[in-house]
């Protein structure tokens, strides 16, 4: 599973990539975000064009740039990101195919274009979106929860939503984010990692929880340890994988799949 670190710190970013992360994300998305996420406690970055240039100079890892949702500014943002060395553009808050097609035209093959599925409209159109020549698709749980007016962040991982999107995606697929296996809240990172493995997730993000949990730790030790933990989950026995899925669902919903299965088995035919 590829790990992409959100950062504009050249020393930190290059150390994490040298330790085994696949690359860096520089985050330009801010238009309408403060209003959309008001009171949600989410992270809103203030990364700049110069930050992208600095991160390009700092690492040979894959460099992704999340721009703003599609609008009159998109062509200029794409041109600037390409000029500064972005390997891929990430287009957030997608709702339909028209904006994706316009962005693909504007990219014009100069770099990859990935999209973030983080609205119910995009979930409903996942098959059509996945038919486009995209470099990757990521399901963003924070904005999806807000768009759905839901309360539980990880609900789409247990109600079939992410499974349904995953089934449509043939290019690299990502969802959620990880931190060190023994950390993570409100769901332990080890259980979340197991569910990402269950889904066949190709990549995920390392964000503020990872950076906070890494304080005083050596990336050269901790990043390989995280990757090794994911590799071990991939080779787990089916019984162990089923048990972890039950633990994950219980952590998200408070309801045990094992108890549900037992209750169903007890019902007379």
What is each stretch, according to the model?
Residues 32-55, 71-76, 92-111, 121-127, ...:
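Active-site-adjacent beta->alpha loops and helix N-cap segments on the catalytic face
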Residues 1-4, 57-68, 107-118, 168-181:
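Short beta-strand/loop segments at the ligand-binding rim of alpha/beta enzyme cores
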Residues 1-63, 70-72, 253-269:
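Conserved N-terminal beta1-alpha1 strand-loop-helix module at the mouth
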Residues 50-60, 113-123, 164-170, 201-206, ...:
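Short, basic, helix/turn surface patches
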Residues 27, 32-37, 145, 157, ...:
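Active-site pocket-lining/capping segments in soluble small-molecule metabolic enzymes
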Residues 24-29, 92, 135-143, 206:
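Non-cysteine beta-strand/loop elements that form the S-adenosyl-L-methionine
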Residues 4-6, 27, 41-45, 64-70, ...:
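Catalytic beta/alpha-barrel core
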Residues 10-19, 72-84, 99, 120-133, ...:
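Catalytic cores of alpha/beta
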